[in-house]
């Protein structure tokens, strides 16, 4: 679980990187479909599933919008993300293992885009936070 120190570190990092969330989302989603090509199956209804394509950019923006929401709901991720959990479980039918895959890609992108801000403390806190987000999103799968 997230300590108060972790929560403060996530909020502090987000205050510095949040304005770049669209670029982070595009890069993270682009990285995911290249490094983990099996994830492309979730986007087979798109005319083009390539890094940086308009659909990837748009979905990356949505994903990071969800992360931004999670930052505001950091004290109760399960309740705060319940609608997103329901959508991913029943409508989109995303395998929850893919949340961890995308989380890893988000961490890699943030570390490369913001090396000064991505301190060891920020890394640990953000990793724990994203794991909490993944757990909250997987809640409705049970």
Curated annotation (Swiss-Prot):
| A Pfam family hit | Globin
State the UniProt keywords alphabetically.
Answer: Acetylation, Heme, Iron, Metal-binding, Oxygen transport, Transport
Alphabetized InterPro entries for the sequence = Globin, Globin-like_sf, Globin/Proto, Hemoglobin_a-typ, Hemoglobin_oxygen_transport, Hemoglobin_pi
Example of a GO biological process term: hydrogen peroxide catabolic process
Q: Where does O2 bind?
A: 59
Positions carrying N-acetylserine: 1
Q: Which family does it belong to?
A: Belongs to the globin family.
Subunit and partners: Heterotetramer of two alpha chains and two beta chains.
Its job: Involved in oxygen transport from gills to the various peripheral tissues.
- Additional detail: This fish has five hemoglobins: Hb C, Hb O, Hb 1, Hb 2 and Hb 3. Hb 0 presents the strongest Bohr effect while Hb 1 presents the weakest Bohr effect.
Protein name in UniProt: Hemoglobin subunit alpha
Q: Which organism is it from?
A: Pagothenia borchgrevinki (Bald rockcod)
